[in-house]
Amino acid sequence: MTLVAGVDSSTQSCKVVVRDLETGATVRTGRASHPDGTEVDPAAWWTALVAAITDAGGLDDVAAISIAGQQHGMVVLDGEGRVIRPALLWNDTRSAGAAADLIAEFGAADLAERTGSVPVASFTLTKLRWLQQNEPQNAARVAAVALPHDWLTWRLRGYGPAGESPLGPVLAELTTDRSDASGTSYWSPATGTYDRALLDAAFGNSGKGHELVLPTVIAPGAHAGTVGRLPEFPTPAGAGATGIVVGAGAGDNAGAALGLGAAAGDVVVSIGTSGTVFAVTETAVRDESGTVAGFADATGLFLPLVATLNAARILDVVAGLLGVGHEELGTLALTAEPGSGGLVLQPYFEGERTPNRPDAAATLFGMTLASTTRENLARAAVEGLLCGLADGLGALRDRGVSASRILLVGGAAQNAAVGVIASEVFDVPVSIPEPGEYVAAGAARQAGWALTGELPAWSTAIAVEHPVRTAAVIGEQYRAVASA
C-alpha cells in the first residue's frame, strides 16, 4: 500500500490525513490546535504541523505530502530567513483603509483586470501597504513575502532561519501554487504572472518593492522538493527511495474543491463561521464590483468565489434565543411552511461582505401575532442563512458560472433542515457529502499527483441528495426586504 499525506493548516488548527493512494481510503489522522488571534507567530504553525504529523503516526511509511492552508496571510521574512513580525491573517481587518486607498489609486476595474479581484482587507497586498505605512522599520527589512502554506512547505523541505534549519535561508527556494498566489492581489490567474509593478507601487516606498523575493508558482501536479533532514523527522526517506515528495500545496478552498472532486457545473457551498460559494471554471473570472474574487484553482483551472460573513453563527444565535440545540432547531424549522409565515431574517449580525454592508445589523421582518412562532423563527433563521448564500450563487451566475449541482459542506450542512431548505432556495439539486476533512483530502490527492504524475481518481461519498423543491416565496420575500 502506497500512502500519501495531506495537511489542512487552517486558522484554528492543523489537520493531517494519511490516505491509501490507490483507493483514497483514510488510513489515519492527526490534529493539533493553533493559537487564537488575527496575528500569529508562524512558529506556532510549524509546532502544530509537527504535532499533527506525529499524531497521525509520522511520515516513515508515507511517500508524499502536500500542505493546503488558510489564504492571504502575510508572512514577511528578512534576508536571514527570519520572520520579521507575527503574520497578519486573512481575518485581520486593520488594512481596510489600505484596501480603500489602493482602490482609489488604481480603480476597481483596473485591479480586477490585472489580478482577477478587487482587494479587501483580507488580501495580502493590503497588508503590505499597511505595513509600509504603519511599521516602516519592519517594511524596510522585508526580503521575501510568503503565504502560510508557502512558509510551511519551505520549512518542511529543510529551509528556514540561518542556524535553525539544515538548508538555511535560501529564499529563492520559496514556492507556492496558483490557487494561493491568486489571493495575494499581486498575481494574475489570467496571465499566470506576478504584477511586480502593482506590488512596487503598493509597497515600493519601503525601498524593497522591486527587490522582494516572491515564491515561485509551480504547476499543480509538480513537486516542490522532498522533506528535509529535520530534527523533527530524523528519517525523511519515508516510503520512497528518493525521499518524501512534497507537493505544490494549495489555498484552503481550492484544496476543498480538489478533495470533493468538484467539476464543471458543481458549485460548492461551504457553511462554516463564514460562508463561501465557489465553482471550478475553465475561464478566468473578473468582477470589478468586488463581489466575486477571481481566484485560480488547484488543477490549472479557475475558482471564482464569493464570501459571506454570516453563516453558521446565524443558527447559533437563533438556537440560543429559542433555548434549543441545532438538531431541535432543524426539527422546528421543518415544521413551518416555506416562507416562515412571512417572517424574514436579514442575518447581518456581523455586518456583511456580500452585499457589502459592513455597518449593517440583523433585522427580523414580518412579525405579527400570527407569524411570530418558534417554528417560523427557526425556519426564518435557516432561510436567511441560505438566502445570503444564494446571493453569492447569483453573483457567480451573473459572471457566467453554470450551476447544475450544489455540493453543500460544513458543519451546518449536517442539519436536516439546512439540506431540505437549500433545495428550495437554490433551485438546484443539492448533494451533501459524507462529513470529512476535504481540504486535507485535497492536499493528499495533490500529493499523489506529485508522486505519480497522475491525479488520483478518488470518489466522494454522498450522504444525502435533495432534488429541487422550488419554493419561490422564500426568495421573493428576501428580495423584497433587501430592496426596501
Language-model features and meaning:
Residues 1-30, 67-105, 279-285, 296-484:
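Glycine/Thr-rich phosphate-binding loops that ligate phosphate moieties of nucleotide
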Residues 1-2, 71, 84-86, 140-143, ...:
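Short coil/turn connectors at secondary-structure junctions
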Residues 4-8, 16, 62-67, 145, ...:
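Short glycine-aspartate micro-motif
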Residues 9-11, 112-242, 247-250:
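Gly/Ser/Thr-rich active-site cleft segment
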Residues 26-61:
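N-terminal phosphate-binding loop and adjacent alpha-helix
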Residues 49-63, 134-139, 196-209, 392-404:
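Phosphate/pyrophosphate-binding loops at sites that engage ATP/ADP/AMP, CoA/4′-phosphopantetheine
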Residues 66-69, 88-91, 115-123, 142-148, ...:
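Active-site nucleophile and cofactor-binding loops and adjacent substrate-binding regions
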Residues 76-79, 156-160, 164-172, 227-231, ...:
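Short acidic, glycine/serine/threonine-rich loops at helix termini
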